[in-house]
Amino acid sequence: MNKKRILGAALALFTALSMSAATYTFKIAKPIEDMKLQIHWCTSGEKSDLEVQNGVATLSKNDFTAQYVRVYYGRAFAMDLYLEPDKDLTVDCNAEAREFNCTGAAATINNYLIKSPFAVLDFNAAAKEEADFIKSSDSVYNANLALMKSANLPAYFVNKEEQRLLFKSYVMFPLYKSYHPYMKKMDDYTPTALYMNKLKELAVMDGNFLGYAEYGDFIMNAVFCQAFQGGDSSQELMAFMDANVKDAKVKTYITNAYAYDVVSSSGLDGNDAIVAYFHKNVSDPKLVDKFDKVCKQWEGLKAGCISPSFTATDINGKQVSLESLKGKYVYIDVWATWCGPCRGELPYMTKLEEQYAGKDIHFVGLSCDSNKSAWEKRIQKGDMKGIQLYLGTKSDFMQKYLINGIPRFILLNREGKIIKADAPRPSEPNITMLFDELLKK
């Protein structure tokens, strides 16, 4: 950052601090008991949790430069706003009626943000051929620019909004590489130079744009699109980043997001390189502390550690413990009747069970359904093989395995020690190779 930019930022913050604090008020129809309203500050990365009292949440603040924020109220609503340290804002929120309205000094910009019918590229557009997909993407951006220009917005905001709209409009563009073959049922697809050149043109590496939440989503997927070539994802990403991502802020942002997601979902086994890469490229104390905490949680789930135990109920009411299954390998499927991806794995699981029938492997289904009768009804159909057990939702086993998404597969050895805390799914070809290797021992 050059001296002029540093001085400009310092002057902007000093000016903001010298003003009386603006007040931001959110009036919520039918508030949810004990639910806080959250404000995510896009430039600073801070979060403000506001108590909602009698349907009203209020924040007075001026220690910031004007920036976009994302406001969340549980699952009831989410919205993008633009807050300025010297302009009051009141937002009336009726989530049930989908009615939102702003009043106060900052009303013009924010009514535009929450009420405008922004153009969005439909998922089905990925079925188009590259040239038509690019035209559709360009049309979305042009439509959003026209909408902005018709809104009579202040000039100081227009420049920022035009940049934000670029990333908002093209946010689906980097996903075309993976969505197109899926939509067209293609076994193989390699984008042409037409698509890749357009992507590179859009994917400007500038950490200052991280003040737009849309840029973070866009640039991460743009980097993934260019980096991933079907090999080891982490190795491909690290190589691409070192060669092409020179902006330190962007590199930190993508490294942190990717490494945290990988470790929090699949643990430490096999991820030594990405953990080291994180510590090489991320120095923000808050990010490092958060990452180190999730790494520490996974330490007890590394290969060779004794597995957390469970006791669950079969369809006849019999209690079955993990300890009673020792002596064979144990392949656990944590699932629920309502889970679409879980149901998608069932045919593959059935084939796997048939292929390894009579072998030294227990196949165990652990249901985390909140509705036990739904599980019972599904099991009573009689088409699910293996050991089917009901675990329920508030399970110590699930908490210790850090399960925050299903299906989750776990593989244990004959002594009840962990082989893989996040094992391959039945639909993945490498699961049979893993089983065959283990059964030779």
Residue ranges with predicted function:
Residues M1-F26, L438-K440:
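Bacterial Sec-dependent N-terminal signal peptides
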Residues A22-K160, R164, F173-L175, Y182-M186:
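A non-transmembrane, solvent-exposed segment enriched in polar/low-complexity residues
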Residues K185-K200, D232-D242, D269-H279, P308-S309:
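Alpha-helical repeat scaffolds
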Residues K251-T313, K318, E323-K328, E354-A357, ...:
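N-proximal helix/coil linker or "cap" segments that precede and/or mark the start of modular domains
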Residues K326-G327, D333-K351:
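Conserved redox-active cysteine motifs that mediate thiol-disulfide chemistry
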Residues G344-G382, T393-Q399, M433:
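Structural microenvironment flanking redox-active thiols in thiol-disulfide oxidoreductases
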Residues G382-M384, L391-D436:
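Thiol/disulfide oxidoreductase modules built on the thioredoxin-like
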